[in-house]
């Protein structure tokens, strides 16, 4: 009955848009699992529609799908997507802030599988334990390991084809406004966007 109320309705989303965002962050418990399956199934079906069209699938907070408390079927779905998306003219971008959770389910099987199927990896500042966990998977040197545990905001290590390079990421003001999570900056943006009172 709960599932009927949540999922058996007309959508208010235009599913033929160039960009489609499926936000399941407000779902919890069993609804989160069902929501993940519905979202992944939809995204995968869309990706397979046209092999000649380029497409990208972004999975933010990927640890929720492959972490310790995740559903193995959801984790298998994400791993299958990572392994096969390129064959459909697509790319998969997985983002997480917690690499420990990324490697928590089934001794890291899903996290390692996703990383091993990723051509490019971008690492921001990591805690020492997280850095050590990823060191073997990405073949990081001791110097690189030390570097990623001391990165300042905007610093990253890009790893592709077993080549690693430290970079400084600079964004435009517009990009910064689109991606910031800083509360002060968000409040400032909201204040600027609010209609002026006369």
Language model regions located:
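Short acidic, S/G/P-rich loop/turn micro-motifs used as interaction or catalytic elements
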Residues: 27-29, 64-66, 99-101, 129, ...
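Conserved ATP-driven motor cores of ASCE-family P-loop NTPases powering translocation/secretion/packaging/pilus
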Residues: 69, 73-75, 79-172
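Acidic, low-complexity intrinsically disordered tails
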Residues: 186-198
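P-loop NTPase motor domains
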Residues: 1-90, 108, 147, 151, ...
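Short, surface-exposed linear segments at secondary-structure transitions and domain or protein termini
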Residues: 174-185
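Short acidic, gly/pro-rich beta-turn/loop elements at beta-sheet edges
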Residues: 32, 168, 179
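Polar low-complexity intrinsically disordered regions
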Residues: 2-3, 113, 169, 196-198
């Amino acid at each position: 009955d709960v599932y009927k109320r949540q999922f058996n309705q007309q959508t208010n989303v235009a599913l033929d848009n160039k960009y489609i965002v499926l936000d399941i962050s407000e779902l919890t418990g069993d609804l989160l699992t069902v929501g993940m399956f519905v979202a992944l199934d939809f995204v995968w079906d869309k990706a397979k529609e046209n092999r000649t069209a380029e497409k990208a699938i972004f999975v933010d907070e990927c640890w929720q799908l492959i972490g310790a408390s995740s559903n193995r079927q959801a984790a298998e779905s994400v791993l299958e997507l990572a392994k096969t998306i390129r064959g459909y003219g697509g790319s998969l971008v997985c983002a997480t802030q917690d690499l420990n959770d990324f490697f928590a389910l089934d001794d890291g099987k899903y996290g390692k599988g996703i990383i091993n199927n990723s051509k490019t990896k971008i690492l921001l500042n990591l805690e020492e334990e997280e850095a050590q966990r990823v060191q073997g998977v990405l073949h990081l040197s001791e110097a690189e390991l030390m570097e990623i545990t001391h990165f300042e905001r905007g610093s990253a290590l890009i790893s592709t084809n077993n080549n690693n390079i430290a970079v400084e990421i600079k964004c435009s003001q517009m990009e910064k406004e689109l991606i910031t999570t800083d509360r002060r900056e968000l409040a400032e943006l909201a204040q600027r966007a609010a209609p002026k009172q006369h």
